[in-house]
From Swiss-Prot:
Heterohexadecamer of 8 large chains and 8 small chains. Its EC number is 4.1.1.39. It comes from Synechococcus sp. (strain RCC307). RuBisCO catalyzes two reactions: the carboxylation of D-ribulose 1,5-bisphosphate, the primary event in carbon dioxide fixation, as well as the oxidative fragmentation of the pentose substrate in the photorespiration process. Both reactions occur simultaneously and in competition at the same active site. It is found in: Carboxysome. One of its GO terms (cellular component) is carboxysome. The active site is at residues 167, 286. The keyword Transferase does not apply. Binds 1 Mg(2+) ion per subunit. Belongs to the RuBisCO large chain family. Type I subfamily. The keyword Magnesium applies. One of its GO terms (biological process) is reductive pentose-phosphate cycle. This is Ribulose bisphosphate carboxylase large chain. Its cofactor is Mg(2+).
Amino acid sequence: MSKKYDAGVKEYRDTYWTPDYVPLDTDLLACFKCTGQEGVPKEEVAAAVAAESSTGTWSTVWSELLTDLDFYKGRCYRIEDVPGDKESFYAFIAYPLDLFEEGSITNVLTSLVGNVFGFKALRHLRLEDIRFPLAFIKTCYGPPNGIVVERDRMNKYGRPLLGCTIKPKLGLSGKNYGRVVYECLRGGLDFTKDDENINSQPFQRWQNRFEFVAEAIRLAEQETGEKKGHYLNVTANTPEEMYERAEFAKELGMPIVMHDFITGGFTANTGLSKWCRKNGMLLHIHRAMHAVIDRHPKHGIHFRVLAKCLRLSGGDQLHTGTVVGKLEGDRQTTLGYIDQLRESFVPEDRSRGNFFDQDWGSMPGVFAVASGGIHVWHMPALVTIFGDDSVLQFGGGTHGHPWGSAAGAAANRVALEACVKARNAGRHLEKESRDILMEAAKHSPELAIALETWKEIKFEFDTVDKLDVQS
């Protein structure tokens, strides 16, 4: 009998380190950044990750004889050094597709980032990327509508969509909240938004907010002749309550609802996405709590993984950071996971942080949402970075206008249309940004005041989580 059936404790690398293995098209592939305890060989650390995230346990057990672990086990098939980091290395692991329930992002993450992150042989562990096989993608529900359908629903084409978060995000009564929504929408925005932590608090119960927002949208649509929307946050303490709120939004004729997908959970998110498709509603996704998981460069889950998982779980819009605003995120990394949200096929490109080719098949794309510390001076860079299939959201950059929210919205709309017109004429937005905006401001006093107000506001901090690439 083979030694693999001998009783006792074995080194993980004897079973789970398989450098000769050639991954199958149907394998789910994962790249982990590993930092092992001192004195533990890389192969043992990597094999331990493969074991603990698939079929392994610390001891040989008799029940292994009842199945074929060689078929079901995860296999570490490659190890690479991390550029500029002598302590860490990349471990590439292949998992057979049968380890995962069809269409369940919850199950995939439970396996890949479950107990293994508490393993004593590791000082740090980070899930950098996942290659989802097309066979798995076809079992996932994906975005309830996607980019093309959303544009048709809102009747908006040829430019990024424009939005803002209502401020102050907490403390307003339902009526005053609706008033701010109206001011922003009549000023020229396409969307306004609940912030992530506005649910149903004593100062503003959710039914009250929904009703006043619906009235504000109807008035703004009548005044402007444009389709408008507001992201009504239906995140709740139970799934039943979440669906009750979504149903009420539908009854009011609202086009879109919102969910905090990390705090709410992937199971709730997938269920809500299915409901939205069935009921003809758009779904905006906020990423609240993501930085707890993704910001440490050596431990956690990279946001590109969360973005991929969200596309599979379902959402029509997802916050991605801004590059130029107040939130973490360098340009190349951000472009890398924006590609994962919108494209049908994304090739391996380490300069953008993509470790694998990713084929999305026919799955609809997701709008990238730029939000957090942005204002009119950022508009040329935002249009360049994010392109048309994006939502640019200015919270303080709308409400902070000296003339009020309507004027702030008008300034942003004029700046956006000026940038799109200049781009379409072949001008270089970032090199000519000042000239483009100042020319537009000659015909818009709202924009002129906004440019003067925000001219000194910058968020120039180094990125904590940088790409691991050789210079």
